[in-house]
Amino acid sequence: MKCHYEALGVRRDASEEELKKAYRKLALKWHPDKNLDNAAEAAEQFKLIQAAYDVLSDPQERAWYDNHREALLKGGLDGEYQDDSLDLLHYFTVTCYSGYGDDEKGFYTVYRNVFEMIAKEELESALEEDMEDFPTFGDSQSDYDTVVHPFYAYWQSFCTQKNFAWKEEYDTRQASNRWEKRAMEKENKKIRDKARKEKNELVRQLVAFIRKRDRRVQAHRKLVEEQNAEKARKAEAMRRQQKLKQAKLAEQYREQSWMAVADLEKELREMEAQYEKQFGDGSGEDEAEDQELRDGQDGKDSDEAEDAELYDGLYCPACDKSFKTEKAMRNHEKSKKHREMVALLKQQLEEEEANFSGPQTDENSLNANSEEEMEDAPKQKLSRKQKKKKQKPAQNYDDNFNENGIGEGVKIDPEDTNLNQNSAKESEDSLQENVGVTETVELCDDPKTEAKSVSKPKGKKAKDTKKSVRVPAEPQTMSDVLISCTTCHSEFPSRNKLFDHLKATGHARAPSSSTSLNSVTNSRNKKEKRKNR
């Protein structure tokens, strides 16, 4: 049987256009009508050309033919196939060659011919795009790097290009349906893969058998061992030299000054002293705290000592701020905000002095109270009600006095300045019985001075001022108070004495005095309720 590709004169990877052109050309050449002189031969050749084109023009027929081409050419698929490939089992013995020379029966000549035949069979089975160059075995004088090593590198991983289609058991063209055809193809594929694997293993085993007896490989292995031994000796000698060199360097080594720990500690202490001198004795505070903890001193004493050191000369009472350096303190004193706070604090102190100081208060007590208030003022906050009470205490008293038309003939007694709640209740009960008693409280300062409104900053500054400045809300202390009877003008040191006098004499019928006393006591009771809130 002749190959279809050879009958059409095309390659095995020819396209449909190439097949069509080749078929038309050969059909015109071998058509019987154009070969009347040799009609029989032309008719036979024309049948082969037509049969080849019928198979190769159909994609499915062409694929099946490509898979079974070798089996069809060598006997068909009916079991009559004769495999004429080289039997490699005969070359697994030492009797197939004699000696390691380059003669006809020598080791290198025999196995060189074997691998050339295997390469030829592979080229016949492979497609043109899969064809590759097979490295040759060489001879006894071949170089290891250029011939021997490439040969064994390729053939030790050899994979055949044969498809072993003649090993198939089923003809897929005889299948009745596609499921049966797929099952046949699956079984045939298993058989082909098994045969291909056996072929690859057989060739690789032959390569291993030859390599073990190849004297070129043995000579190269010996050379490599000698080179490795020489490298090991050189490496050992170099290691010893390096070790001796390191030992000499260790003997000559001297610690540098900058590596000494003692010098580092000394330098660290100097740096700490410098920072302590520049930024204050912060480290001294830590040492003092540690010492106090070790000695078991009281925590309050240590806090007071720290506060005294912290606020000693570097504290602004107006702004309630502390500073680490004098320079920062001076910069703060020059700021606009500090000046505003100082001015506001002075105004607050003046108001407090005007509201709470009595006529007999000496300058020493006034200065002491002012200093205490300056220290406490930034830390306190005022509510809206307290601010109103602070601004208009004297005005309420003046209004009460002016409404009732009294106050000119009332005398002030210095003994009864602080009134308790019991006396207030008694006076309220007695006033309900129409007791005619007048009581007038006069403050030390001029009412005009008290009535003046203090200028305050507006906007955000006013809010900051309210937050930073806080005036203690204390009950207003009255100056000396004198209690007398409006009927007989008798003076009494206390209310109890006055009440006894009124009950005994019946002088509690004066209608004009009850109104004024009610207004005074009512205003005082309102203030007491506000303070109790």
UniProtKB/Swiss-Prot annotation:
GO terms for molecular function: nucleic acid binding; zinc ion binding. The modification Phosphoserine is found at residues 283, 302, 370, 512. Residues 278-311, 327-473, 503-533 are annotated as: Disordered. Keywords: Chaperone, Cytoplasm, Metal-binding, Nucleus, Phosphoprotein, Repeat, Zinc, Zinc-finger. Residues 381-392, 455-464, 524-533 have a biased composition (Basic residues). CDD domains: DnaJ. GO terms for cellular component: cytoplasm; nucleolus. This is DnaJ homolog subfamily C member 21. It comes from Bos taurus (Bovine).
